[in-house]
């Protein structure tokens, strides 16, 4: 009898622990229209409803490490914390001087060295992993899936044609293309989609998927997860193993071999936010979540940062008429552009590709037709700042000296081009470049890079991103592309 009693007690305790392991946690937005339900069962999942209607079914999230453990499989919750925030944050050089940030958060602290944090804003749900591990480790893979209640229609940007082939060849791209609209089941499983992308959940409600706070971690691509799942699954570029200088005018570093993991983690850290913005088309356009979820500014005094328009000589191929000199990449032409900018109230003139010796990836070698100090001084007299174009590798290989040298000359900033990757090494470069430029009072315009993902909040000297299928493309594409969404 005693044995039966002990067995019954043990079974009761086991059931209690099992029920606890299967416990779900709900988190609602401040206004209550959005709700996420997080389940810590055999797998860690979350689902999202909007006004009580499912817009995202239970979707798994996990990180697999090089020691064989997987954060998110059989998670063991050690503690739960909740907070609510309603604050006003500064947002210089954004679309408003300040923003209201209001959200409710849920953090599940696991018995291992990690946590997962969820936030519910009125316009979206976001989550991120947090590592407390003090020893270095590698992330072999990340599971980021989005499973929808039905075969919804999606509007997505595939990696552009010309990068066809396996995913490895598609990891090298400029993140600019027109958008394709198709049912989730009809999306090409052999092609990567970059972010952001939108899924139409019906009744005027859209779900926009993106990420932010993307520092020192590979960017998220999505691909078709299979018709049975009505969803999308994440793909990440592995860390580069072997790089070779090449590409456009020898200004890029091309990945020839990759490692067997996507990220190398050396200290406790937070991981990028996975964001689902939910609402109408207007709500999506008005959302500030990418900015709000990023790390706060690391520049205390931003008074030196001056946004402005730029006169862009590359667009019309340096062609000007009715002048008494030969137009082109030379001092006289740039003085003409400076005069034009001063007359029209344009704050900057850019010296696009061609001012430095080509194919050398050396920004200290200026072509003989250019007297750069004279151009900079002339611009200062006219109240016009000078921005220099720089290929990524030429900029990165001598970053400190380049920034120091041209800052002392009076140059105001750089347009950095041809990154064309978003593996961990490249996203780390973006932050390193911004930090170095800030030390020398330089602004940055990043071209040929991934979507905006929080960098401009953390380093507000980054004034622009040019990763859209924009004006540049009109020089060589047929007019039919103008009617396609970009």
Task: For each feature predicted by the language model, list its residue ranges.
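Residue-level detector of conserved catalytic or cofactor/ligand-binding positions
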Residues: 477-486
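Substrate-binding cleft/loops of secretory-pathway carbohydrate-active enzymes
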Residues: 405, 452-474
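Glycine-enriched loop-and-adjacent helix/strand subsegments that border the catalytic/binding cleft
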Residues: 249-263, 268-345
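N-terminal accessory beta-strand-rich subdomains and adjacent acidic, glycine-rich linkers
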Residues: 22-292
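Bacterial Sec-dependent N-terminal signal peptides
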Residues: 1-23
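Acidic/polar loop patches that form or flank catalytic/metal-binding clefts of enzymes
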Residues: 443-448, 471-477
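Substrate-binding cleft of carbohydrate-active enzyme catalytic domains
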Residues: 307-451
């Amino acid at each position: 009898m005693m044995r039966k009693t002990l067995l019954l007690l043990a079974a009761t305790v086991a059931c209690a622990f099992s029920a606890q392991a299967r416990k779900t946690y709900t988190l609602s937005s401040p206004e209550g229209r959005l709700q996420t339900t997080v389940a810590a069962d055999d797998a860690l999942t979350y689902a999202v409803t909007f006004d009580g209607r499912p817009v995202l079914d239970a979707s798994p999230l996990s990180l697999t490490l090089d020691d064989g453990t997987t954060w998110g499989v059989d998670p063991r919750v050690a503690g739960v914390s909740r907070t609510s925030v309603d604050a006003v944050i500064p947002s210089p050089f954004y679309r408003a001087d300040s923003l209201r940030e209001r959200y409710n958060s849920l953090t599940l602290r696991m018995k291992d060295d990690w946590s997962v944090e969820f936030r519910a804003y009125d316009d979206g749900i976001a989550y991120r992993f947090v590592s407390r591990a003090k020893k270095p480790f590698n992330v072999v893979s990340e599971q980021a899936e989005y499973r929808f209640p039905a075969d919804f229609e999606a509007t997505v940007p595939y990696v552009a044609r010309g990068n066809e082939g396996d995913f490895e060849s598609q990891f090298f791209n400029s993140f600019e293309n027109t958008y394709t609209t198709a049912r989730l089941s009809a999306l090409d499983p052999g092609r990567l989609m970059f972010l952001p992308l939108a899924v139409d959940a019906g009744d005027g409600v859209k779900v926009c998927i993106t990420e932010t706070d993307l520092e020192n971690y590979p960017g998220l691509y999505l691909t078709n997860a299979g018709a049975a799942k009505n969803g999308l699954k994440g793909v990440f570029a592995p860390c580069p193993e072997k790089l070779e200088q090449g590409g456009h005018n020898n200004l890029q570093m091309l990945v020839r071999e990759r490692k067997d993991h996507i990220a190398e983690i050396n200290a406790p850290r937070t991981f990028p936010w996975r964001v689902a913005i939910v609402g109408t088309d207007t709500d999506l356009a008005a959302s500030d979540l990418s900015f709000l979820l990023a790390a706060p500014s690391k520049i205390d005094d931003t008074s030196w940062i001056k946004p402005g328009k730029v006169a862009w000589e590359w667009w019309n191929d340096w062609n000007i008429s009715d002048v008494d000199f030969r137009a082109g990449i030379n001092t006289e032409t740039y003085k003409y552009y400076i005069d034009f900018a001063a007359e029209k109230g344009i704050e900057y003139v850019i010296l696009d590709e061609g001012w430095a010796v080509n194919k050398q990836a050396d920004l200290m070698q200026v072509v003989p037709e250019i007297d750069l100090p004279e151009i900079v001084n002339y611009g200062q007299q006219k109240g016009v700042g000078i921005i220099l174009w720089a290929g990524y590798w030429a900029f990165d290989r001598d970053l400190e000296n380049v920034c120091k040298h041209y800052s002392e000359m009076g140059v105001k900033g750089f347009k950095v081009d041809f990154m064309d990757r978003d593996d961990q090494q490249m996203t780390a470069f973006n932050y390193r470049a911004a930090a170095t430029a800030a030390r020398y009072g330089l602004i940055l315009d990043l071209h040929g890079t991934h979507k905006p993902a929080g960098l401009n909040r953390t380093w507000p000297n980054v004034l622009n991103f040019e990763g859209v299928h924009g004006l540049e493309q009109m020089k060589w594409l047929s007019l039919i592309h103008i009617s396609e969404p970009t």
